[in-house]
Amino acid sequence: MSRRRGKVEPRHIEGDPKYNDKVISKFINCLMVDGKKSVAESVFYDALEVIAKKTGQDPFAVFQEALENAKPQVEVKSRRVGGVTYQVPIEVRPERRLALGIRWLIKYSRGRNEKSMKNKLAAEFMEAQKGTGSAIKKKEDIRKMADANKAFSHYRW
């Protein structure tokens, strides 16, 4: 149990150097491995260039739309009541929605079969923008599970 009183102040995060956007900065931080931020930045910006070449659209807009499509609305949490564990659907807080969307896009990008990470990331962004892709499938699976367990929504806390 947490012994902390009150709310924790959210950390201040600087915008990224190219677009001055905090969401991109957060995405790059999540993409980073072993503290190599410059590598993560180059992978991300190269992925945006790949998107611009392949689609001819604004890559920043494609990224934003892909992230918006990957964000979950609801999720399920386990709640134990009388020796039985129920999957209780709950609405996701905005900060957690962003974190989950970023996490899923990166996770399923890494699992793809393209040659380089920039191509994997670009392909996942383009698929997520269209409403397909593994990150969107994950979101839909969780939504379906929440719909199936709607009967237990009165067990919220």
Swiss-Prot record:
InterPro entries: Ribosomal_uS7 (IPR000235), Ribosomal_uS7_bac/org-type (IPR005717), Ribosomal_uS7_CS (IPR020606), Ribosomal_uS7_dom (IPR023798), Ribosomal_uS7_dom_sf (IPR036823). CDD domains: uS7_Bacteria. One of its GO terms (cellular component) is small ribosomal subunit. Pfam families: Ribosomal_S7. One of its GO terms (molecular function) is rRNA binding. Keywords: Ribonucleoprotein, Ribosomal protein, RNA-binding, rRNA-binding, tRNA-binding. GO terms for biological process: translation. Belongs to the universal ribosomal protein uS7 family. One of the primary rRNA binding proteins, it binds directly to 16S rRNA where it nucleates assembly of the head domain of the 30S subunit. Is located at the subunit interface close to the decoding center, probably blocks exit of the E-site tRNA. Part of the 30S ribosomal subunit. Contacts proteins S9 and S11. This is Small ribosomal subunit protein uS7. It comes from Leptospira biflexa serovar Patoc (strain Patoc 1 / ATCC 23582 / Paris). The lineage of its organism: Bacteria, Pseudomonadati, Spirochaetota, Spirochaetia, Leptospirales. The gene is rpsG.
